[in-house]
């Protein structure tokens, strides 16, 4: 029979081959429809004439992805540096105050600080130094007053350093009080174009006029510092070599400064016996960095 001699002509195989033909035809039809919708890559497209739509579609919101509420690495580094600074202040400020108290007391006794007898009408204390009086000693209130003044001076120095740093970075308004009359001041930064990027210290520009700004004067503090720097440069020309170093130090972040102070405070005395042989090499590298 035919199904024994020609098994490929059976109904089952015919159905299988017919199904394959239908699938191939469907794929071909889908490909042609895709080319009709998006264009055949092998055909030349005619230029499209731009038209203006009468209806405005809302702008799409594109840009950087939203920041996750989790803490970023820089924030974590800042938190760790802040904790180190707090620990540093908590452990070292009493020692600093005691050393400054010792120096202050030694000014009154050039021959050496005598011992405090600690005699009191109510309490009898042992002999001790005037910089470490117990609460039962009469000199405790004076020691406490000296320490309080020292703490105020240290706090004032830190505040001045912070204000100078913020002013140098341009984060403080250089003219906090608005003048009564608006005058055009020829600031060094304000004579540039409005589109240019200003370098600190910033001028307080009220409004741009003809490429310049109507400014307020730069504060006297920065002007005095600039005058002193120009005066020093006029008499000591070698200070020009320090300008790249100062610019580099000014670009360091506040966190890096705290970490540097932390390392110098703890490892500085131990490194004094190691660094002297390498100082000429450091000077040579600095000269190469400046001149090359």
Swiss-Prot record:
Topological domain spans for side Intravirion: 1-147, 97-147, 262-267
Residue ranges, annotated region (Pre-S): 1-70
UniProt-annotated stretches for the region Pre-S2: 11-70
Ranges per topology, Virion surface: 1-75, 169-240, 291-292
InterPro entries given in the database record: HBV_HBSAG (IPR000349)
Keywords for the protein's UniProt record, in alphabetical order: Fusion of virus membrane with host membrane, Glycoprotein, Host-virus interaction, Lipoprotein, Membrane, Myristate, Transmembrane, Transmembrane helix, Viral attachment to host cell, Viral envelope protein, Viral penetration into host cytoplasm, Virion, Virus entry into host cell
GO annotation (BP), single: virion attachment to host cell
Positions glycosylated per UniProt: 212
Region: Pre-S1, residue numbers: 1-10
Source species, domain of life: Viruses
Ranges that cross the membrane: 76-96, 148-168, 241-261, 268-290
GO cellular component labels: membrane; viral envelope; virion membrane
Post-translational modification: Isoform M is N-glycosylated by host at the pre-S2 region. Myristoylated.
Transmembrane as UniProt keyword: yes
Subcellular locations according to the entry: Virion membrane
Domain note: The large envelope protein is synthesized with the pre-S region at the cytosolic side of the endoplasmic reticulum and, hence will be within the virion after budding. Therefore the pre-S region is not N-glycosylated. Later a post-translational translocation of N-terminal pre-S and TM1 domains occur in about 50% of proteins at the virion surface. These molecules change their topology by an unknown mechanism, resulting in exposure of pre-S region at virion surface.
Role according to the record: The large envelope protein exists in two topological conformations, one which is termed 'external' or Le-HBsAg and the other 'internal' or Li-HBsAg. In its external conformation the protein attaches the virus to cell receptors and thereby initiating infection. This interaction determines the species specificity and liver tropism. The large envelope protein probably also assumes fusion between virion and host membranes. In its internal conformation the protein plays a role in virion morphogenesis and mediates the contact with the nucleocapsid like a matrix protein.
Family according to the record: Belongs to the orthohepadnavirus major surface antigen family.
Protein name: Large envelope protein
């Amino acid at each position: 029979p035919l199904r024994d001699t020609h098994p490929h002509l059976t109904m089952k195989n015919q159905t299988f081959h017919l199904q394959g033909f239908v699938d191939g035809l469907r794929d071909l039809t889908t490909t042609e429809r895709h080319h009709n919708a998006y264009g055949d890559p092998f055909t030349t497209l005619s230029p499209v004439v731009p038209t203006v739509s009468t209806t405005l579609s809302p702008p799409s919101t594109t840009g950087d992805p939203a920041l996750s509420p989790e803490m970023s690495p820089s924030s974590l580094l800042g938190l760790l540096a802040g904790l180190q600074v707090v620990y540093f202040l908590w452990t070292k400020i009493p020692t600093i105050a005691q050393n400054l108290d010792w120096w202050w007391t030694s000014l009154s006794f050039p021959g050496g600080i005598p011992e405090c007898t600690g005699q009191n009408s109510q309490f009898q204390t042992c002999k001790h130094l005037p910089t470490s009086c117990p609460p039962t000693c009469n000199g405790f209130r004076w020691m406490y007053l000296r320490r309080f003044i020292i703490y105020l001076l240290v706090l004032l120095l830190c505040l001045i350093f912070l204000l100078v740093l913020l002013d140098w970075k341009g984060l403080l308004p250089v003219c906090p009080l608005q003048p009564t009359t608006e005058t055009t001041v020829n600031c060094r930064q304000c004579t540039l174009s409005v589109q240019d990027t200003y370098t600190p210290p910033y001028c307080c520009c009220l409004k741009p006029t003809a490429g310049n700004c109507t400014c307020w004067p730069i504060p006297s503090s920065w002007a005095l510092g600039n005058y002193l720097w120009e005066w020093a440069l006029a008499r000591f020309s070698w200070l020009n070599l320090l300008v790249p170093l100062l610019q580099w130090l000014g670009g360091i972040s506040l966190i890096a400064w705290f970490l540097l102070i932390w390392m110098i405070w703890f490892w500085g005395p131990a490194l004094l016996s190691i660094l002297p042989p390498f100082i000429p090499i450091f000077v040579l590298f600095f000269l190469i960095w400046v001149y090359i």
